[in-house]
Design a protein with these regions (language model features):
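Helix N-cap at the start of a conserved alpha-helix in ABC-type nucleotide-binding domains
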Residues: 36, 158-160
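Catalytic Walker B motif of ABC-type/P-loop ATPase nucleotide-binding domains
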Residues: 147-151, 156
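ABC-family P-loop ATPase nucleotide-binding domains
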Residues: 76-135
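Helical segment within the ABC ATPase nucleotide-binding domain
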Residues: 161-176
Length: 197
């Protein structure tokens, strides 16, 4: 599913050398303190930054050779980014439907209601926990084969964190051949969720 071999990135005062593998049907955790290179690894994996060395394979292809249809199989959550705060959940659903052929708008809106996320309210009016749940739901909504989740529980209270982790568990039960790569600096989150570190 995913193989990273000696991924290297160097900045002033920072040097990354990361190797890891994510197997089909597994949840793999990437743990480390803030500033250890978790987000850098994810950004390189997604082609958002250019690595200084190493190799990344996704779905058996080099990351730089992924085609748009391959990228459709990825679901992504970054802790420090998301949707325009001026959109509603229904507005996001319309955008997602135009991007992802496998996106089920009605299922997405039903899941929003299930997790008490109003579909007609602007995202900027959501609480921190609501925004986190919404980002994860959006990443899950098009039946991604590989979820890349960068600190999806950061800043959440215990109840919201448990809800997000349960969303991921349910997804894996329903999509047994999918995989998740999740990062966190909270070891208890990963210990309760992951098959591998």
């Amino acid at each position: 599913m995913l193989k990273i071999s000696h991924l290297q990135k160097h900045y002033r005062g920072f040097s990354l050398d990361c190797s890891m593998e994510v197997q089909p049907g597994m949840i793999t955790g990437l743990i480390g303190r803030n500033g250890s290179g978790k987000s850098t690894t994810f950004k390189a994996l997604l082609g958002l930054i250019h690595p200084d060395g190493g190799e990344i394979e996704v779905f058996g292809k080099k990351a730089e050779e992924l085609k748009p249809e391959d990228k459709q199989k990825l679901g992504v959550v970054f802790a420090d980014s998301g949707f325009s705060m001026y959109l509603t959940a229904a507005g996001v659903a319309n955008i997602m439907k135009s991007i992802y052929p496998d996106f089920d708008r009605e299922e997405f809106l039903q899941q929003c209601r299930r997790f008490n996320l109003p579909t007609d309210k602007k995202i900027k009016e959501f609480s921190t926990g609501m925004k986190a749940k919404f980002k994860v739901l959006a990443a899950l909504s098009h039946k991604a084969e590989l979820l890349i989740l960068d600190e999806p529980t950061v800043g959440l209270d215990v109840i919201a964190r448990d809800e997000v982790l349960n969303m991921l568990r349910e997804y894996m039960e329903e999509n047994v051949s999918s995989s998740i790569l999740i990062s966190s600096h909270i070891s208890s989150d990963l210990e309760s969720l992951c098959d591998d570190f």
